[in-house]
Curated annotation (Swiss-Prot):
Gene designation per UniProt: cofC
Organism taxonomic ancestry: Archaea, Methanobacteriati, Methanobacteriota, Stenosarchaea group, Methanomicrobia
Assembly description: Homodimer.
Alphabetical keyword list: GTP-binding, Nucleotide-binding, Nucleotidyltransferase, Transferase
Family indicated by similarity: Belongs to the CofC family.
Record's protein name: 2-phospho-L-lactate guanylyltransferase
EC assignment: 2.7.7.68
Statement: the UniProt record of this protein carries the keyword Transferase: yes
Organism from which the protein derives: Methanocorpusculum labreanum (strain ATCC 43576 / DSM 4855 / Z)
Length: 212
């Protein structure tokens, strides 16, 4: 099935909760690398993507729309313009694969949702995007299920470790370094990050210093 992906992206000073382990310049570079992994997975399904960016950004592999309003407003501006199914996917899901995306877009339901850890929403696939709207932040997963019910849309909930694990905090680096396969994982190792097992627990180090 052909679809078009919407990927919200903040190019300047992203991922502030990683400030304890990455400088602003590093966070901006790391965010770009994670985004590239997401775009690559989308393109390998044979589909295209538009970035919803908060400031000017150039990307050779996706269209770019600059929207300075909030996340919900930007996505809800875009959805009615779609003439094909829409995939809304966050840019900080570097473990996503074409196979995991195929699982989402193959749903028999009107839409599919991948919940994030902690009650958020990491991926939404909706076959008729002009009928849907998003309400991110907080317990958005339950809210999106409620919106679908109000609109009488059937929903499939997709349980996927690769898509439910977003990289927001230092502790999230553990999962990426263990289970990742793309450029974001390689970037971490190239920048001095490593794993160790101490007292039966996996820890993250950078240049020999424990960070998680």
């Amino acid at each position: 099935m052909y679809f078009h992906a919407l990927i919200p992206f903040k190019p300047v000073n992203p991922k502030t909760r990683l400030s304890s382990v990455l400088s602003q310049e590093e966070r901006e570079e790391f965010a770009r690398i994670m985004l590239e992994d997401v775009i690559l997975a989308v393109r390998r399904t044979g589909c295209s993507a538009t970035l919803l960016c908060t400031s000017k950004y150039e990307c050779r592999d996706a269209l770019v729309a600059i929207r300075k309003e909030g996340l919900n407003e930007a996505i809800n501006w875009a959805l009615p313009q779609f003439h094909c199914p829409a995939l809304i996917i966050m840019s900080d899901l570097p473990m996503v694969t074409p196979g995991s995306l195929q699982r989402v877009i193959s749903t028999k339901a009107d839409m599919a949702i991948v919940p994030g850890l902690g009650g958020g929403t990491n991926v939404i696939f909706v076959k008729k995007p002009e009928k849907f709207h998003v309400e991110y932040y907080g317990f958005s997963f339950r809210r999106h299920l409620q919106i679908a019910e109000e609109l009488e849309l059937t929903v499939e909930i997709i349980d996927s470790m690769r898509m439910s694990t977003d990289v927001d905090e230092p502790a999230d680096l553990v999962e990426l370094m263990i289970h990742g396969h793309g450029n974001a994982r390689e970037w971490l190792y190239e920048h001095g990050f490593s794993l160790s097992v101490e007292d039966g627990r996996v820890k993250v180090h950078r240049d020999g210093k424990e960070v998680v």
